[in-house]
């Protein structure tokens, strides 16, 4: 009887414990260490400046006191995030397996022909990285394994392989590797006849080489070790030490970077120096690698141009003579003075000439019209031109790999919010299309289950902003459905509507997914970019909030169900919009966000700073300082309510240093007036692009989606 009493007592205690509410995890409280920053007689106090570590501190075998304090804080934030989202772990795993399950594990790319070989890559089941192959002469030939990135990645927490390039004699493979995610690549070389690695190794590069015609000489871009600026072009002879490499060009202007490539004709090597507003090209015959590069057109402030060559002619895409949306010129190779340039495609106010590719008998232009990509084909022999037809209202098309000049076939890709990425060959003579591959989406996916459309939101100044959105059919426009609104809006980069199989996990749970094509991109032409940069940058942020208000007013969602997402410069967007109108959003995901704008742009030692003064402004000038300060998310944190916020970053990020989001979260937590979630997730092994494996990166997506789905009650 006594024993029964004890058992009953234990059961009652256990029951009481199970009914006790789980104690809410304690959020980290970052220590304040005020640092006074004074510019233009204006004082700022940064309480979290101490979170900034140097590369030397991060790479040290034994952490010093400051490093340990930073690591402890980041790990505490990671633990807090895990605790706050532990109830979503099952959902996260479900989402991960769901997204992974849509990906065909054994898959390969469509082969393309280059210099007598067909090249393609393949993924194998269970493998995170691709394998690269080629076949000689015909697709029926025996395949030759060039590189297995999975083997290179063995034992590495992070692995990026880039810039695969084959010598003109088809015997040597060059490629770049980065095992830290700082984008300092080491170039290696492989003898394809023996499969053996050559002893040549070139460190601190962009990871790509351009071959001279002799297959023994190559050129590459070297980086500044501290700022990572691509600042010099070097010449390397196979079989020699990299210390003996010859510098053929050094870019003295710290606001410029440089790179090297080759024309379509393969006759010329081309060095490009560029910044946001100005470019300059230098050329040298590829069969004379020891020669001196000569300037094509001397740089002029705000003159942007690029060149290519075929059939003894240079083609020049240029914005000279107020061609804001660019025009295409042509000139003989033996006399390319600007006086000899002739118009091939004139400038148009409503069409942005984005680029072009050359064939012996054709020129294919990429044109952006009314926020959509268009492909235009010119017959160089007859002068006739036509556009490739596309059926959907909202789509994205891009010129793909076209290495063979003597061809009637154009390779391009096509995708939309409902159509997976598709690869086509287009016969430019007969105008017939051949679908070579549509990316297979496993499971029960059918594009017929989804609806995409284009809307136009009106900004506060009357500008019409395009919005692309997609939802599962059966969606009711009653204002009750959750929505994810995404945007970028910087650098003139256009966020085109493309298929993302991961988004299906939101759509199938009742979400609508929308993209706001805000100013700062180039969706509506080059002026669209100009109107969202420098002293017009505020337009980017107000455009996004105006799009959010429009979608709410049109009953696509409501503020308690609206989520926003952006990364990098899009993370800056997220920080700015929640400072301006936090009441519009239930939750925000800011990935690797650039949020400490003024402090970063005042420091030329930080990677990308000098190169980006033409994007944001140079805060050493007082006008820009105060304007940038007016929107910098870190500087504009207020004592107000904020939505639920999830912030992600990478400890080794070279583009947006980890301390920016870390400081931002610490300041938000100290000042915000609400009890909403504020979470920081730092990948301690990755950089700006996150995890390097094709499946592992889905875990971050699963975390972000679980965060939103949980808040949406899904």
Give the location of each predicted region.
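C-terminal motif of bacterial Sec signal peptides marking the signal peptidase cleavage site
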Residues: 15-18
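Blade-edge beta-strand/turn elements of extracellular beta-propeller
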Residues: 191-203, 240-252, 287-297, 336-346, ...
């Amino acid at each position: 009887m006594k024993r029964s009493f004890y058992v009953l007592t234990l059961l009652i205690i256990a029951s009481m414990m199970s009914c006790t509410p789980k104690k809410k995890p304690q959020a980290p409280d970052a220590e304040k260490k005020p640092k006074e920053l004074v510019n233009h007689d204006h004082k700022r106090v940064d309480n979290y400046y101490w979170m900034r570590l140097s590369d030397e501190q991060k790479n040290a075998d034994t952490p010093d006191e400051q490093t340990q304090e930073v690591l402890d804080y980041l790990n505490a934030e990671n633990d807090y995030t895990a605790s706050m989202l532990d109830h979503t772990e099952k959902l996260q795993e479900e989402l991960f397996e769901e997204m992974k399950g849509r990906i065909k594990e054994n898959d390969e790319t469509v082969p393309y022909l280059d210099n007598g070989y067909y090249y393609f890559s393949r993924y194998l089941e269970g493998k995170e990285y691709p394998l690269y192959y080629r076949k000689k002469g015909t697709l029926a030939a025996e395949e030759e394994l060039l590189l297995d990135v999975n083997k290179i990645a063995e034992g590495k927490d992070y692995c990026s392989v880039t810039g695969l390039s084959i010598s003109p004699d088809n015997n040597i493979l060059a490629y770049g590797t980065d095992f830290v995610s700082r984008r300092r690549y080491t170039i290696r070389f492989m003898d394809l006849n023996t499969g053996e690695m050559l002893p040549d190794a070139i460190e601190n590069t962009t990871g790509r080489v351009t071959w001279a015609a002799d297959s023994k000489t190559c050129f590459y871009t070297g980086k500044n070790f501290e700022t990572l600026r691509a600042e010099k072009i070097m010449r390397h002879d196979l079989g020699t030490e990299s210390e003996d490499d010859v510098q053929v060009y050094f870019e003295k202007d710290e606001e410029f970077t440089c790179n090297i490539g080759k024309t379509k004709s393969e006759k010329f090597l081309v060095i490009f120096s560029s910044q946001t507003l100005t470019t300059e090209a230098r050329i040298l015959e590829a069969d004379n690698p020891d020669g001196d590069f000569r300037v094509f057109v001397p740089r002029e402030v705000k003159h942007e141009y690029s060149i290519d060559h075929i059939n003894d002619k240079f083609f020049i895409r240029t914005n000279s003579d107020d061609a804001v949306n660019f025009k295409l010129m042509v000139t003989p190779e033996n006399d390319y003075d600007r006086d000899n340039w002739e118009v091939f495609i004139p400038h148009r106010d409503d069409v942005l000439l984005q680029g072009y590719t050359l064939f012996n008998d054709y020129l294919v232009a990429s044109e952006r019209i009314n926020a959509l990509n268009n492909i235009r084909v010119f017959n160089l022999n007859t002068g006739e031109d036509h556009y490739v037809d596309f059926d959907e209202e909202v789509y994205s098309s891009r010129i793909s790999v076209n290495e063979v000049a003597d061809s009637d076939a154009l390779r391009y890709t096509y995708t939309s919010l409902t159509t997976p990425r598709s690869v086509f060959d287009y016969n430019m003579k007969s105008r017939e299309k051949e679908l070579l591959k549509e990316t297979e989406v496993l499971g029960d996916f059918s594009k017929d289950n989804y609806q995409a459309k284009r809307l136009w939101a009106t900004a506060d100044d009357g500008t019409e902003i395009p919005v692309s959105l997609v939802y599962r059919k059966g969606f009711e426009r009653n204002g009750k459905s959750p929505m994810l609104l995404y945007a970028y809006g910087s650098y003139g980069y256009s966020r085109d509507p493309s298929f993302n199989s991961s988004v299906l996990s939101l759509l199938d749970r009742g979400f609508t997914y929308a993209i706001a094509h805000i100013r700062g991109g180039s969706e509506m032409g080059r002026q669209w970019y100009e109107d969202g940069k420098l002293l017009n940058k505020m337009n980017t942020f107000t455009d996004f909030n105006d799009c959010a208000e429009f979608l709410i007013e049109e009953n696509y969602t409501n503020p308690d169900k609206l989520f926003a997402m952006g990364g990098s410069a899009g993370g800056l967007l997220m920080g700015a919009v929640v400072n301006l109108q936090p009441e519009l959003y239930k939750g925000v995901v800011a990935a690797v966000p650039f949020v400490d704008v003024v402090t970063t742009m005042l420091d030329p030692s930080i990677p990308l700073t000098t190169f980006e003064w033409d994007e944001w402004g140079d805060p050493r000038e007082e006008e820009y300082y105060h304007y940038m300060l007016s929107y910098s998310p870190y500087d504009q944190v207020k004592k107000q309510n904020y939505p639920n916020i999830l912030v992600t970053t990478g400890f080794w990020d070279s583009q947006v240093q980890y301390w920016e989001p870390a400081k931002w979260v610490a300041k938000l937590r100290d000042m915000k007036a609400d009890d909403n979630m504020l979470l920081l997730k730092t990948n301690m092994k990755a950089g700006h692009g996150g995890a390097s494996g094709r499946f592992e990166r889905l875990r971050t997506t699963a975390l972000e989606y679980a965060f939103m789905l949980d808040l949406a009650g899904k």
